[in-house]
Amino acid sequence: MQELYKELLKDVKGVTLHEQPADPRYDSNFWLCAATLDPAVRIKGQENAYKEVIKTAVGGAAGVIKAVDSATTDCQPNENVEALRVFMLGKKVECRPVWKPMHKQPVYKDAPAYVNGVSESIFKVGFCLPAGPYVSDDDVRYIVECIKEAIV
């Protein structure tokens, strides 16, 4: 699946598929197919990216919700990554940002953290592509076509 994503995305400017280092000590099974989206890439609907999310509640652990008046936080994906997620959802494809850095998770807000900015940088531009045993080659082709369609 990773190789098919790699082949189909190779000419899509601004989308970079995560690859393992050329070092033989690494041997990824690519259970997660992740990519980054260049901040300069524009996505259809990007100007409304954070207007599309639910603004009345932000999910928490075990279904706990907290009323909010803003759909944004101090650490969130770039607008184009969120716009791509929303666009893909409209195409019945679920993709998501990469995981929010642990030190930015509410449960760890008061915990000590040793950071250098890398995790926040990756979170702003990273997204996960559908992957798994039930994602077919035809599914991957459809997913990539949707990504191409989303880019303005």
What are these regions (language model features)?
Residues 1-152:
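PLP-dependent aminotransferase class I/II
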